[in-house]
């Protein structure tokens, strides 16, 4: 059974304690009414994983756990089988005692692009909105964060996160809650807020920016990563039914337009830190994610376009500060 009591106890002692006015009731309602039909199967996979304390843990350069002596073939097979019961694995990679989870996305590449532009994360309390399986939460801890909290309503991601946590020695420096940003009160409590790969899924992107701002302390830093198109500050793509086969894509601005949106929402010191085209090496089908991936979403005759004829995915990282 996946429980959240450790997180409640943790925040009861710090500046997030006011979150306890709403959070336990929200989680209790989720446990009663909103669990996915496969949630028990997924949580059982987590339950059956062995409890291991890593002899060597690297969260600075990767998410890697090693034991002092190699695990037996039977132990490795058990871990591998249970983790495969949690497929598809989209965000990673993870290397856990010799079991290498080769995820759809090379999320480590994104982290390498983002990290040089961040304020020092040492001692910070961080919120990662739409955190997926929590890969970047662990990298934030590796970069020195005091506490990394992720929110994502996708319940498979919660189980993947808890599986990795268990194999990292039940590390309590990172936590994932099965919530969306709209369920959070205006906590104004996080030193850094990340929103990566979320904005284009929001029907009201400016509302999302305001919601992110409401989670930051004064002088806090926002890290925003999202799809963009080429163009000036007035350029925004509004796709039709689908973009790269995704139905729920609403607005894809240019990077200059996104900078203007952030300034309109009251952020300051806004800068475009990085823009890059997503490649089929960074997002691809693997044995841990066996369905279609980016190569299937691009025009086979012109890789600069999606199958719908839109510009192929490129992503920008913007950094901003709340005054």
Swiss-Prot record:
Q: Which domain of life is it from?
A: Bacteria
Listed as disulfide-bonded, the cysteine pairs are none
The gene behind this protein is: cmoB
Please tell me where carboxy-S-adenosyl-L-methionine binds in this chain. 91, 105, 110, 130, 152-154, 181-182, 196, 200, 315
GO BP annotations of the record are:
tRNA wobble uridine modification
Q: Which Gene3D superfamilies does this chain map to?
A: Vaccinia Virus protein VP39 (3.40.50.150)
Organism of origin: Salmonella agona (strain SL483)
Protein name per the record: tRNA U34 carboxymethyltransferase
Under the heading HAMAP family, the entry gives: tRNA_carboxymethyltr_CmoB (MF_01590)
State its role. Catalyzes carboxymethyl transfer from carboxy-S-adenosyl-L-methionine (Cx-SAM) to 5-hydroxyuridine (ho5U) to form 5-carboxymethoxyuridine (cmo5U) at position 34 in tRNAs.
What CDD domains does this protein map onto?
Answer: AdoMet_MTases
Q: Of which family is this protein a member?
A: Belongs to the class I-like SAM-binding methyltransferase superfamily. CmoB family.
Q: Name one GO molecular function term.
A: transferase activity, transferring alkyl or aryl (other than methyl) groups
């Amino acid at each position: 059974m996946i429980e959240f009591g450790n997180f409640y106890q943790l925040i009861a002692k710090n500046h997030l304690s006011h979150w306890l006015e709403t959070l336990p009731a929200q989680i209790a309602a989720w446990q009663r009414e909103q669990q996915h039909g496969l949630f028990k199967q997924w949580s059982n996979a987590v339950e059956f994983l062995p409890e291991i304390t890593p002899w060597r843990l690297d969260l600075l350069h990767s998410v890697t756990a090693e034991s002092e002596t190699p695990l037996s073939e039977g132990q490795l097979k058990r871990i591998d089988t249970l983790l495969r019961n949690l497929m598809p694995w989209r965000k990673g990679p993870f290397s856990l005692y010799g079991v290498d989870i080769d995820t759809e996305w090379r999320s480590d590449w994104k982290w390498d692009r983002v990290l040089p532009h961040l304020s020092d994360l040492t001692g910070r309390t961080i919120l990662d909105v739409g955190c997926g399986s929590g890969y970047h939460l662990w990298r934030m801890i590796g970069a020195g964060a005091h506490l990394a909290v992720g929110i994502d309503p996708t319940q498979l991601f919660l189980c993947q996160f808890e599986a990795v946590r268990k194999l990292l020695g039940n590390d309590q420096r990172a936590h994932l809650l099965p919530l969306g940003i709209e369920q959070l009160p205006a906590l104004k409590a996080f030193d850094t807020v990340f929103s990566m790969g979320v904005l284009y899924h929001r029907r009201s992107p400016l509302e999302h920016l305001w919601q992110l701002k409401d989670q930051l302390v004064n002088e806090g830093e926002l890290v925003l990563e999202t799809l963009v198109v080429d163009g000036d500050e007035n350029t925004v793509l509004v796709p039709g039914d689908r973009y790269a086969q995704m139905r729920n894509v609403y607005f894809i601005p240019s990077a200059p337009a996104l900078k203007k949106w952030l300034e309109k929402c009251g952020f300051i010191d806004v800068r475009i830190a990085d823009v890059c085209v997503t490649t089929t090496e960074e997002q691809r089908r693997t044995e841990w994610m066996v369905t279609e991936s980016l190569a299937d979403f691009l025009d086979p005759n012109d890789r600069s376009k999606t199958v719908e004829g839109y510009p192929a995915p490129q992503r920008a990282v913007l950094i901003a500060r709340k005054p």
